[in-house]
C-alpha cells in the first residue's frame, strides 16, 4: 500500500485524487493532507479520510482546525514551511501529489523530488519557474516524476518507454519523434468577438466549456496562458526544441494531446475530460487502476475539430512561447506577473485584457538575472510581483 501526501488537498485536483483513492482503498492510504487556509473543507476531508497529518499553510487556520478535530482521531496538525518540507520528505511517504496552485507549490514539490519520492506533478509552475534545476534534482535523487496535467499525461502515454523513463533528458528525434502536438480547447472565449473581450467578467472567464477547475486555472484557460505554461512545462519534461512543440486548438477536449512520429504516424490519447483519468494513470503507472471515469462514447462525441491558435485573441499564449525561447529567467518573470494579474482580475481590480498587458510589461521591464539556485528563483519571483502590483494602479 502506498502512503500518499496530497499537496493542495482542498482544490479540484485534490478532490479528484481522493476520489481515485476511494475507488482503490486497498492500494493507497492518505498519509497527509495539505491545504492553505480552508478549515471547513480540511475538517471534512480529515473526517472522511483519517490522515495521519493535516498541514495548514496558514498558522491561524491550523489552530482553528486543531480546535475542531475530534481528539480521538489522533490526527497531527502542523503548520510552517519547515514542517511541510519535513512532511513531504518523511521516510514513511511513498508518493506526493503536487497540486498546490502557483509558485507556492515550488518549494515543497522540489523538496519531495530531492528526497527521491514518487512525485505526481500537477503544479506546472514548478517547472515553469525552476526548469533545469528541477530536472537536475530529479536526475540526481532518482525521484520518479510523472506528469498529471491532462495534456502532458497524454503526451507521456503516447511516448516510447525510453522517453518515459528519461524525462527531461530524452532525445525525441532519436526515438523517431518529429513533433509533440499540445491540444487546448481555446476556453470560453474562443469564438467571442475580439471587441467584447475587454468587458468579460471573472464569472464568464471561469465558465470553462469542458473542464471543472479552480478559478485561477480557469482564467488562465480563458487567456490561454494555461496552454502557454503547459508549453513551457512540456519543453522541460520532454526536452523539446522550439520547432518540435506545437499548439493545436481542439474545442471538444476529447483528444488530450498527440505525438507525431517521423514515419507520419500520429498517436493520440483520448478520453472524457475528467482529471481522474490522468491522476489514476500516474498513481498506478506502469499498471492501470479504476479511475471512476466513464469510458468515451464515440457516438456521443460525434465530431472532432481543430484549428490554429489566434495570437491576436490569445496574446498571453504568444508571450509564453516567446518567454520559453528566451529562457528560465523570462518564464519565471512571466509566471509571477500572471499570478498577480489574474488575482487582480478575479478581485475585479482590472479588466480581462489587462492581464496580457501586465504580463507583457513585466516581461519587457523586469531586469533578468542569472538563476543558479532556488533562492535566485524566489528573489526574481518576488521582484516581479512587486513590479506587477505597482502596475495595477495603471489599469484600475
UniProtKB/Swiss-Prot annotation:
SUPFAM superfamilies: 1-deoxy-D-xylulose-5-phosphate reductoisomerase, C-terminal domain, Glyceraldehyde-3-phosphate dehydrogenase-like, C-terminal domain, NAD(P)-binding Rossmann-fold domains
Keyword Repressor listed: no
InterPro entries per UniProt: DXP_reductoisomerase, DXP_reductoisomerase_C, DXP_reductoisomerase_N, DXPR_C, DXPR_C_sf, NAD(P)-bd_dom_sf
Function of the molecule: Catalyzes the NADPH-dependent rearrangement and reduction of 1-deoxy-D-xylulose-5-phosphate (DXP) to 2-C-methyl-D-erythritol 4-phosphate (MEP).
Disulfide bonds: none
The protein's name in its UniProt record: 1-deoxy-D-xylulose 5-phosphate reductoisomerase
Enzyme Commission identifier(s): 1.1.1.267
Gene3D superfamilies associated with the record: 1.10.1740.10, NAD(P)-binding Rossmann-like Domain (3.40.50.720)
Claim: Hydrolase is one of the keywords in the record: no
This protein's pathway: Isoprenoid biosynthesis; isopentenyl diphosphate biosynthesis via DXP pathway; isopentenyl diphosphate from 1-deoxy-D-xylulose 5-phosphate: step 1/6
Residues at which 1-deoxy-D-xylulose 5-phosphate binds: 124, 150-151, 185, 208, 221, 226-227, 230
Pfam families per UniProt: DXP_redisom_C (PF08436), DXP_reductoisom (PF02670), DXPR_C (PF13288)
Top-tier EC class: oxidoreductase
Annotated positions binding Mn(2+): 149, 151, 230
Family as reported in the entry's similarity comment: Belongs to the DXR family.
Organism: Shewanella oneidensis (strain ATCC 700550 / JCM 31522 / CIP 106686 / LMG 19005 / NCIMB 14063 / MR-1)
Co-factor(s): Mg(2+); Mn(2+)
Primary gene name: dxr
Catalytic activity: 2-C-methyl-D-erythritol 4-phosphate + NADP(+) = 1-deoxy-D-xylulose 5-phosphate + NADPH + H(+)
Annotated keywords: Isoprene biosynthesis, Manganese, Metal-binding, NADP, Oxidoreductase
GO terms under biological process: isopentenyl diphosphate biosynthetic process, methylerythritol 4-phosphate pathway involved in terpenoid biosynthetic process
GO molecular function, one term: manganese ion binding
Binding-site positions, NADPH: 10-13, 123, 125, 214
Amino acid at each position: 500500500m502506498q502512503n500518499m501526501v496530497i499537496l493542495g488537498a482542498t482544490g479540484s485536483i485534490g478532490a479528484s485524487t481522493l476520489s481515485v483513492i476511494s475507488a482503490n482503498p486497498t492500494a493507497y492510504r492518505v498519509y497527509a493532507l495539505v491545504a492553505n487556509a480552508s478549515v471547513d473543507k480540511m475538517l471534512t476531508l480529515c473526517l472522511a479520510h483519517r490522515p495521519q497529518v493535516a498541514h495548514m499553510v496558514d498558522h491561524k487556520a491550523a489552530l482553528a482546525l486543531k480546535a475542531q478535530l475530534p481528539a480521538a482521531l489522533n490526527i497531527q496538525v502542523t503548520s510552517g514551511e519547515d514542517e511541510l518540507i519535513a512532511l513531504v520528505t518523511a521516510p514513511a511517504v511513498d508518493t506526493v501529489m503536487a497540486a498546490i496552485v502557483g509558485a507556492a507549490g515550488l518549494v515543497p514539490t522540489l523538496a519531495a523530488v530531492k528526497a527521491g519520492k514518487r512525485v505526481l506533478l500537477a503544479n506546472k509552475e514548478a517547472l515553469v519557474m525552476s526548469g533545469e534545476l528541477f530536472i537536475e534534482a530529479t536526475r540526481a535523487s532518482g525521484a520518479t516524476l510523472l506528469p498529471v496535467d491532462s495534456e502532458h499525461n497524454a503526451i507521456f502515454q503516447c511516448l516510447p518507454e525510453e522517453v518515459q523513463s528519461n524525462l527531461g533528458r530524452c532525445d525525441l528525434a532519436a526515438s523517431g519523434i518529429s513533433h509533440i502536438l499540445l491540444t487546448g480547447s481555446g476556453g470560453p472565449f474562443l469564438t467571442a468577438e475580439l471587441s467584447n473581450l475587454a468587458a468579460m467578467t471573472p464569472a464568464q472567464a471561469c465558465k470553462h466549456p469542458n473542464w471543472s477547475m479552480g478559478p485561477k486555472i480557469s482564467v488562465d484557460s480563458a487567456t490561454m496562458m494555461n496552454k502557454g505554461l503547459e508549453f513551457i512545462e512540456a519543453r522541460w519534461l520532454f526536452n523539446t526544441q522550439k520547432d518540435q512543440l506545437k499548439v493545436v486548438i481542439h474545442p471538444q477536449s476529447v483528444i488530450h494531446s498527440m505525438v507525431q512520429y517521423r514515419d507520419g504516424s500520429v498517436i493520440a490519447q483520448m478520453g472524457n475530460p475528467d482529471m481522474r483519468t490522468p491522476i489514476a494513470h500516474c498513481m498506478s503507472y506502469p499498471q492501470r487502476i479504476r479511475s471512476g471515469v466513464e469510458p468515451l462514447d464515440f457516438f456521443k462525441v460525434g465530431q472532432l475539430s481543430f484549428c490554429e491558435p489566434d495570437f491576436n485573441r490569445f496574446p498571453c499564449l504568444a508571450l509564453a512561447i516567446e518567454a520559453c525561447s528566451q529562457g528560465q529567467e523570462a518564464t519565471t518573470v512571466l509566471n509571477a506577473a500572471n499570478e498577480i494579474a489574474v488575482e487582480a482580475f478575479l478581485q475585479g481590480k482590472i479588466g480581462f485584457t489587462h492581464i496580457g498587458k501586465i504580463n507583457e510589461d513585466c516581461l519587457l521591464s523586469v531586469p533578468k538575472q542569472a538563476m543558479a539556485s532556488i533562492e535566485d528563483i524566489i528573489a526574481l519571483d518576488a521582484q516581479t510581483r512587486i513590479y506587477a502590483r505597482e502596475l495595477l494602479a495603471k489599469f484600475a
